């Protein structure tokens, strides 16, 4: 070839065209025989041109590729092999291959297809055996190039024909090789495996299997035909080709499986295994293994169910195991054996990956059934045998290559895949219940599993994104999910520890999936401890607090073993989570709150477990709330509290420390309250045995000093909560801070407030409830807010120091109530919440009543009643709501100064008190807040009922015993003092001086002034002999009994209940002991005399002052007046010292003023009494009992009469009136006489009393003319008197209960006529008629008006009242044993002729002051 052509081929396009024209002309000449020196000249010329084309393609970068293809097309038909020089043809094929490879690129695909078509159009000429390599290389390159471009979608779908052409061309090549008997199959297999079969990816083989069988068959059949002809291949070469055959079989198996149109129909792998069986028939080790593989693949390819399939497979697995056991020791290090193991591993991988989908699903279906346990046992044994021999695998071309450069071990990958195959087989197995209990399949499986995980730990290529590890974790999760019996659970327990070593390599989500399935499978653990450990592992792995909380709730709901908390179980778990410190703390915090909130009564071991694992002091405070019966926990709380208080002296406490102080203080407080409780019957709280009760029940330690510690604990808790609350929003919570349990804070704050309220310390209780109100408002805790507000609504006077606008809070509460009360019936609320809403309505009614909104108050009470009637559990029962409604109505009635015409008339206050007594007696608890509310309500009722009854001169002792029983059993000193003060007030009103003396001793004991034990010692050492009671003669005793019985039969009140305006000296009855010097009255009003433990509390100062007022009244009634002047002067100074303290006395200040007025009148200081009475009348506040105003007015008018008497008339002996309740006035009342005569005539058959007008007794020695005789006025040697006047009548009290019935038949006060006392003559006429029958008592209703008249007072009318009404008169309810001790067993006091009396006014007997 000339140099011009060479230059032209590398030149421009026109130059290339010129060269192409020259070459074309040249080959035309060759075809005509011109210029041919020999037969090889055209071939040599063509080679020279092809060489230049190769160089030109390289230099011009395919710029003229189309022209080059045209030049090649011109030359190829004119060349053929030259037999004498085979190298020329080899060079020709090499040049064509180079040009085709150069054109097989994306930018020259058209020229490539043109060039390949040109090569394919020429006959396949194999001059030498090695020439097939060039053709095969061209076909494979073209096939792979077109496939690659089609994957990139750079060619149209029609380009698929090029693939068909390539496959057909390879089939032609294989036929040519078979015809030429080319026996070099080793190189052919290597080239085919590298480019088309075993070394290609799974995706490529899937694509290849998807090609039409018409094209692929034209390649597969010639290839298998070529491979079947060994042409006497030596055994050594066959041994070397063993790996390539296995690789080709593996690829054909995949092609058979992936075939779309007819999977497993071609059975290419089986055909190749038959060929290999024949090829290796003389190579014994390989021959047997190929036979086993042939039958194994044949079973895989089965398309129909056969009867003996299971047994066949079991026998085949046993033969494999036998072969591996006997040949493994000999050939384990040989390459073919290692290749065989790797091939079998890949075959098993293909088999198990298609277990649940065609075409191998039939194979797995036939393994199920009755004998599936034996089949799977054989299968697991086969895999276990392969796994044991695979440890000898060093290298194999069949092994999968790892993408990680650090991993070069095929052995580890082989072992890992064997283990995953076993896990997949186990997951696909569906055993029956009986088969699950068979342990035979689990034994080889456990070995496989353990070895696989051990190998996985040592692999360097495994990571969170490694496909092998992801698949292994997924399989382990499915194994755990499959667990349904303890035998299956043994597999899970086997991989726990190895899996823990792999945990750093596993993605968090994948690991969480495994742990979740282990969590569910743990229910089948034989050991409950292990089950709890496994469950705690999954729970600890949850980092979302909400999800963790819900899962913990479910765990503790279904847990069979609650000896430890989840946090502690996790610490001993075989798979502990690698938690950060923040996650560890979060786990404990959520675990703690779940136990405290979800379990109403957590088991003690569970709480102790949480206590052992606590992280800070706040955890101890929360746990102590549930372990208040544990003395050790309470001791720890006390130590923590002391430690924090010590720290507070050195540095400010953090808010969490303040919160811990609050909770620990409550724990210590409640334990102390519980420890001081005792039990005794309510019958033991009788009035005459209170001191014995204190001694008998070991209550000598009960006093105000001991209770001071409890108050300190409660106030310390509230102070801690308040300090925390003030800083709650100012400082954000850090990651190390424990979430605040606001529910626990509210509960403990309410417990402190309830303790203070129940103990009676109202100032401290107000602060506690105000804090709770603010917390409830901030947290939108509606029921907490309403409960706190209810405390303030029930108070008559709010503390001025409190920053509380009650009117604004009431408006806010009304909005809440309007939203809440319609929803209470929906069942979304607890019973205690129902109670809170209804109690708030009741106390809000009380609030509006104090604001003079009576109609609004009544409407609120009606709403509460209607709301209560909607709950079936309250209907027909006396619950706290009903008692509260009755109490509020009682307050509305007896504290109302004027009646509203628009409101219905209610029963009288005393009758309402009787109703309240019945309701309390029949009390029924409905919710958890009822008992506390009842105790607070009873404390108010004791005070209010005492005030109401005392101002009406009647006795209402029903609440005293109940309340005293409650407070004494609870060990509450201040509440006991309040009850005893009320009782003492009533005793003094009724002049029960013995009982009053006992109350004073008890009060001194409770106030820690003089212990009762010392009093009892002094009382025991003293010798008290009642003179009169021990020396009274029989006649005097009979007379005393007779007069007492007469009074009882006549239903007459004792003389001390009469409102006598003459204040002559009344000598008291003898007391059991004199008042010692330590009981000086001055100590009650002097700052120095007040005990130190009472000086710091305004409430206790007021209590002490009230006791002093009552003590002064007691001294006055005993006529021990030496200290009273100094006391009342000191009391006035005490009251002026602190107006706020004075205001807290309430109605007891009015009582004190009335007592003071009475004393001033007794001392004839009428002017001073008048000024005090006028001031007192003005000081009565609007909401006070109306009787206070009446009492001040009575004292005022009486003092005026005593200051300016109208005239003095000679007072006659008071005679016993035949009509009862007559006033002992100077002038006789004619109306009474006429009324009594008329009544006698209208009831002729009525038995009458026998009145003794005279008694032949000698006058006593030393008898004085005082208005009342002392019990020491006589002795046993007193001679009988010649005359005893028993005509003095004792007035019968008219109770409020009788007012309505009496007023019906009684004329108006203006129509009443004056009457005179019954003359003695009329009395004497009746003295002879004392028969066995008694006259029906006649009740006289007194006028309420007050007149000043010189000689007469308001008349009284006589009215008969039936004796069958048991509730109409309090006198009828009084039993014999209720008669005051001062009137029993004691001679009747003699009434000598009095001096002329001053003119007095007739008043109601209940206005006694």
From Swiss-Prot:
GO terms for cellular component: cytoplasm. GO terms for biological process: cell division; Malpighian tubule morphogenesis; mitotic sister chromatid segregation. It is found in: Cytoplasm. This is Protein three rows. Residues 1052-1058 are annotated as: Separase cleavage-site. Its main location: cytoplasm. Residues 1260-1284, 1297-1409 are annotated as: Disordered. Residues 1264-1273, 1300-1310 have a biased composition (Low complexity).
